[in-house]
Amino acid sequence: MRYLPRRNEYGISRCNVNDEEKWQMEQLPMVKTMEKQTESIQPSLVVNIGKGGQRDLAEAFADRHGVPITDRPGEALTLTFDKTGTSLSGYGLSYQGDFRNMLHRVTQGRLEHEMLVRAAKPEKKMGKCLRAIDATAGMGEDSFLLAAYGYEVTLFEQNPVVAALLKDAVRRARRNQELKEIANRMEVIQGDSIVYLSQLVEPVDVIYLDPMFPKRQKTGLVNKKLQLIQKLEAPCSSENELFDAALLAKPSKIIVKRPLKAPCLAGREPSYALNGKAIRYDCYTM
């Protein structure tokens, strides 16, 4: 019997439902409150509803965050809702999340060689469902790797624009035959993960942190598209608070992604680290 996730009252998966049942995520008041909070939005941002776009999503986003809707975005940073999904454009660049680009990393035996998967692999073989929280989701690529390995992942993204792009990417992935099994293990919440972690009752296996590092310089053609995202995301200014919230949540392990030569997050030395050519994963076992 294959098990599918059911969410408890704190949004964390419970793998105790057989595949003849359907589950729906319960929206608890705390999460609703987080979703309703108006986050800082780029002043020049506008919303555009293109042909075949989901008008209800576009209007709900514009109303919640006080962003104007326009048919002629011009040079402004534009969040477009059209038949292809949700995309961001501006500064001569455009970006839309697409997990199809990740398929080559999770097929043909490559997944086991991913550093993050090696860091997140349980030390003992477990029969239970693995659960993770990605507290700084961004566009969800790392969460996709965890979900491909078998984790039920709750992704938190505080920036409303990035969260809208991420939710759309997950929605489209769930309609893709090759991606849907992985995407069904990903649940996106727009809000402050510190608030969520401080109220978490049931511990998870992994809490993953990848706060934006202010000194990291990204180059290359692919990353030019991500420059749009970086214009919206601010470097983490509350590293101590974020790390303390993760500690208080009492996971089995905290994994922190860092540039190879960067100092440890909040000055906390890890239990061990996995080093790559440009990045490392600091692992804190509880």
Per-region residue spans from a language model:
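S-adenosyl-L-methionine
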Residues: 30-130, 159, 163-202
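Conserved proline-anchored active-site loop of SAM-dependent methyltransferases
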Residues: 132-145, 204-220
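Conserved SAM-binding motif I beta-strand of class I
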Residues: 152-157
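Mobile active-site "lid"/loop adjacent to the S-adenosyl-L-methionine
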Residues: 212-242
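Conserved Class I SAM-dependent methyltransferase catalytic core
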Residues: 239-285
